[in-house]
Structures are given as structure tokens and as C-alpha cells.
Amino acid sequence: MVGGDEVIANSFLEAGELVSFKRGEDIVSQGDVEDDSVYFLLSGAADVFVNGKRRDDIQRTAPITVGEMSALNPAQKRSATVRAASRQLVALKVEGETFRKVVGENREFLRRVHEDFSGRGRQAILATGISRRTSGWNWTVISLTAGVLSAAAIWYTLRVDGNPVFVRVLLPLVVGLTIFLLTLLADPVYRFFRLGTLCVGAILVDEALQWQVRGSFMGAEFQYQISSSGDPQQATALLAPIVLGALAAYLFWIDTTKR
């Protein structure tokens, strides 16, 4: 950030203080408004934590500055916690007032500060996109687990004698599927792709198989029969899954490139 400017470097060296941190010690703390100092990391690396969670995609490694945003806006709270990740981290601590004074006296330095802010903003946006891409299927597993547990709970409740077989079988399936879909739709990542895939899969199964259910409403057990579809006219119905598949692919492309 100093860009080899000896005048600026000497100003910071004269006013600054060498400080060291051991692994696990906080350099700056999220939400802090009292400390508006800037830390020029001279050696070592630090991890970034937001709301107590470590950002695996972001690490501050020397030479780099930490805390300049709060130095320029002293009333602003620290947006993240920066914690020493190296065995020992050495930094030059410059008070926020000194940093603001140097920035105000040197336009070129101010331009470099803004460029650094812009670069970190792009990095954060990129990291957010990557995080969203990798978390989509994790949410699918969560949704499936919620659906299975809900279905199991309903089945356990209705397992006692006296309930018709179709109630003990059908109701848990309906509840489980409903909970699965509701949980799935709660996650905005790839919802169109997964929902479209679910629709296509359901239609393909329906077209490929014949379903028969036999039995009386009261008392008698139901007989289920599933067989391959032998009707050649059903091949024309594959147009619907193809259209839905194309739509799902288009929405998936929007999710991955436009968001």
C-alpha cells in the first residue's frame, strides 16, 4: 500500500510501534470501536473471522495492512476479527489519527488505499460466490434428512393398530416429501436446478412405470404392483421432460453465472 514511498514509510515508522502476537491472539476484534489503529503486518499470517466463523477463503499474509477501514472511519465498528495464525506475528501499529493525517496529505497514497479496498471487495464477492456453489448440495442433504425424520416420526405415531394401511404408508410419505421440499426451497442456492431435476425425475419415473394399487378401503391389505410401461405411445410424452430439463439447465446456468 505504501508503494515504495519513503516519505510515507518514514512517517509511519516514526509514529508507529512494533507489536507482536502469538498464535490465537486477536489483532483486531469485530465490533470494537475504541481501537482505530492500523496494523502493517511485517511477518506472519492471520485468519479472518466474521461472526465467530473463520473465513477459509481469506487470509492476511505479510506484507499487508489490517484495520485501515476503521482508521478512515473511526466511528465505524470493526467488521471482522483478525487473529494471528502464525506461531508469531510481527506488525507495525499506527494510530488511526496518524494514518488519517498521512492519507489527507497524500492523494497518491489515498488512491492506493481505495484500490486496496476495491480489490478486497472483489475478493469477498468472489469468495461468497464460491461458498454458495459449494454449500448447495449440503443443504440438499439437510433437506433430505429433515424429510426422512419427519416421515419416520409420523410413521411411529401411526404404527398402532386401528389405522388403515394406506394411512400408515401414505401419510408419512406425503409429510416427508412436503418437509423435504419446504426445507429445500428455504435455500436460495440452486433451488431452480434441484426443483427442476426433481420434476423431471418424477415425470420420467411416471412415464417408465405402470402403477396399480388394489384393495378395499377398510380392513383388507393393499396390493401394490409396479411394472415397466409397454405402451409405445408414451414415448411421445418424453417431450415434457425434455422441455423441463432444458428449463432446469437454463435456470442452473443463471444460478451459477449471474448471481
From Swiss-Prot:
<keyword id="KW-1003">Cell membrane</keyword>
<comment type="function">
    <text>Pycsar (pyrimidine cyclase system for antiphage resistance) provides immunity against bacteriophage. The pyrimidine cyclase (PycC) synthesizes cyclic nucleotides in response to infection; these serve as specific second messenger signals. The signals activate the adjacent effector, leading to bacterial cell death and abortive phage infection. A clade B Pycsar system.</text>
</comment>
<keyword id="KW-0051">Antiviral defense</keyword>
<dbReference type="GO" id="GO:0051607">
    <property type="term" value="P:defense response to virus"/>
</dbReference>
<dbReference type="InterPro" id="IPR018490">
    <property type="entry name" value="cNMP-bd_dom_sf"/>
</dbReference>
<keyword id="KW-0997">Cell inner membrane</keyword>
<dbReference type="GO" id="GO:0016787">
    <property type="term" value="F:hydrolase activity"/>
</dbReference>
<comment type="function">
    <text>The effector gene of a two-gene Pycsar system. Expression of this and adjacent uridylate cyclase RsmPycC (AC A0A1V0HUX5) probably confers resistance to bacteriophage. The genes are probably only expressed in response to bacteriophage infection. Probably only responds to cUMP (produced by its cognate NTP cyclase), it may act by degrading NAD(+) and/or by impairing membrane integrity.</text>
</comment>
<dbReference type="InterPro" id="IPR000595">
    <property type="entry name" value="cNMP-bd_dom"/>
</dbReference>
<feature type="transmembrane region" description="Helical">
    <location>
        <begin position="169"/>
        <end position="189"/>
    </location>
</feature>
<dbReference type="GO" id="GO:0000166">
    <property type="term" value="F:nucleotide binding"/>
</dbReference>
<protein>
    <recommendedName>
        <fullName>Pycsar effector protein RsmPycTIR</fullName>
        <ecNumber>3.2.2.5</ecNumber>
    </recommendedName>
</protein>
<keyword id="KW-0547">Nucleotide-binding</keyword>
<keyword id="KW-0812">Transmembrane</keyword>
<dbReference type="GO" id="GO:0005886">
    <property type="term" value="C:plasma membrane"/>
</dbReference>
<feature type="region of interest" description="TIR-like">
    <location>
        <begin position="126"/>
        <end position="229"/>
    </location>
</feature>
<feature type="binding site">
    <location>
        <begin position="1"/>
        <end position="120"/>
    </location>
    <ligand>
        <name>a nucleoside 3',5'-cyclic phosphate</name>
    </ligand>
</feature>
<dbReference type="InterPro" id="IPR014710">
    <property type="entry name" value="RmlC-like_jellyroll"/>
</dbReference>
<keyword id="KW-0472">Membrane</keyword>
<feature type="transmembrane region" description="Helical">
    <location>
        <begin position="136"/>
        <end position="156"/>
    </location>
</feature>
<feature type="transmembrane region" description="Helical">
    <location>
        <begin position="234"/>
        <end position="254"/>
    </location>
</feature>
<keyword id="KW-0378">Hydrolase</keyword>
<keyword id="KW-1133">Transmembrane helix</keyword>
<dbReference type="Pfam" id="PF00027">
    <property type="entry name" value="cNMP_binding"/>
</dbReference>
